[in-house]
Curated annotation (Swiss-Prot):
This is Transcription termination/antitermination protein NusG. The gene is nusG. Residues 130-161 form the KOW domain. Keywords: Transcription, Transcription antitermination, Transcription regulation, Transcription termination. PROSITE patterns: NUSG. InterPro entries: KOW, NGN, NGN-like_dom, NGN_dom_sf, NusG-like, Rib_uL2_dom2, Transcrpt_antiterm_NusG, Transcrpt_antiterm_NusG_bac_CS. The lineage of its organism: Bacteria, Pseudomonadati, Pseudomonadota, Gammaproteobacteria, Enterobacterales. Participates in transcription elongation, termination and antitermination. In the absence of Rho, increases the rate of transcription elongation by the RNA polymerase (RNAP), probably by partially suppressing pausing. In the presence of Rho, modulates most Rho-dependent termination events by interacting with the RNAP to render the complex more susceptible to the termination activity of Rho. May be required to overcome a kinetic limitation of Rho to function at certain terminators. Also involved in ribosomal RNA transcriptional antitermination. Monomer. Interacts with the transcription termination factor Rho and with RNA polymerase.
């Protein structure tokens, strides 16, 4: 008895903004053509992010890889044609157009670890970096410009060096109180 070929992960390029629909269509095509044994998971890796709009905290999802869908599958002519026949699929990434290359196990592990880390804590939608120029939009230092010194994603706070009367003064601010320069 021969062992079934191993399912590997492939990256499929989709029209940007249609990743979810492509993933859903692909799942439906797999069922419709009775090819479940050739396919594993089909996913669009996302993370939950928090953005502050109009003073309100809102949760939304951000895609790790906009424009791409990850597909676990056994690569053969039938599975290749099935994926390529799904509307809004532009093709596979890696390898050649007729012989796509799977992503490495190391890359798969990195993606899965990132998905697990994301699990509980939503991240801020806007990411700040030390040295970046920001403008204070709220509070006693509104309309002042400053430079980010430290970022605390756990507490959603920044330490910003603001120039007050010609002197650089460190000020602790909430993410909602600043906007990118």
């Amino acid at each position: 008895m021969s062992e079934a070929p191993k399912k590997r992960w492939y990256v499929v390029q989709a029209f940007s903004g249609f990743e979810g629909r492509v993933a859903q269509s692909l799942r439906e095509h797999i069922k419709l053509h009775d090819m479940e044994e050739l396919f594993g998971e089909v996913m669009v890796p996302t993370e939950e992010v928090v953005e502050i709009r109009g003073g309100q905290r809102r949760k939304s999802e951000r895609k790790f890889f906009p424009g791409y869908v990850l597909v676990q599958m056994v690569m053969n002519d039938a599975s290749w044609h099935l994926v390529r026949s799904v509307p809004r699929v532009m093709g596979f990434i890696g390898g050649t157009s007729d012989r796509p290359a799977p992503i490495s196990d190391k890359e798969v592990d990195a993606i899965m670890n990132r998905l697990q880390q994301v699990g509980d804590k939503p991240r801020p939608k806007t990411l700040f970096e030390p040295g970046e120029l920001v403008r204070v939009s709220d509070g006693p230092f509104a309309d002042f410009n400053g430079v980010v010194e430290e970022v605390d994603y756990e507490k959603s706070r920044l330490k910003v060096s603001v120039s007050i009367f010609g002197r650089a003064t460190p000020v602790e601010l909430d993410f909602s109180q600043v906007e990118k320069g």
